[in-house]
């Protein structure tokens, strides 16, 4: 049997209707969302390009949910500083996106942020 308190529902902002983003964000808690999943894509590591820290800064003004920043970018260590200033709870990077895993893990931890590692 699935125990709801042992799982976290994390909603991706990319799935939102951007013309109604404010209302979509307000609805998240009502639907049991416990965390925001914020995809960052650079057009190099993945083909698509998505939002950066400026948009997340605006979004965080309207939510009180933890944020997991998912860096789908080449050289993710270049993005850690910007997102750490936004008081995010987790930064996830792709194992394949960097050769220096130890350094980026230490960098993220030095900002008192939890580390996530995504593997394709």
Describe the residue ranges of each PLM region:
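N-terminal amphipathic alpha-helix/helix-capping segment at the start of soluble metabolic enzymes
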Residues: 1-15, 22
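A short, Lys/Arg-enriched amphipathic alpha-helix followed by its capping loop at the start of a domain
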Residues: 27-33
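Glycine-rich, proline-tolerant flexible connector loops at the mouths of alpha/beta enzymes
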Residues: 36-53
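Conserved anion-binding
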Residues: 5, 17-20, 62, 78-79, ...
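Conserved, mostly hydrophobic/aromatic
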Residues: 21, 28, 39, 83
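Hydrophobic faces of well-ordered beta-strands that scaffold small-molecule active sites
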Residues: 7-12, 36-38, 59, 67-71, ...
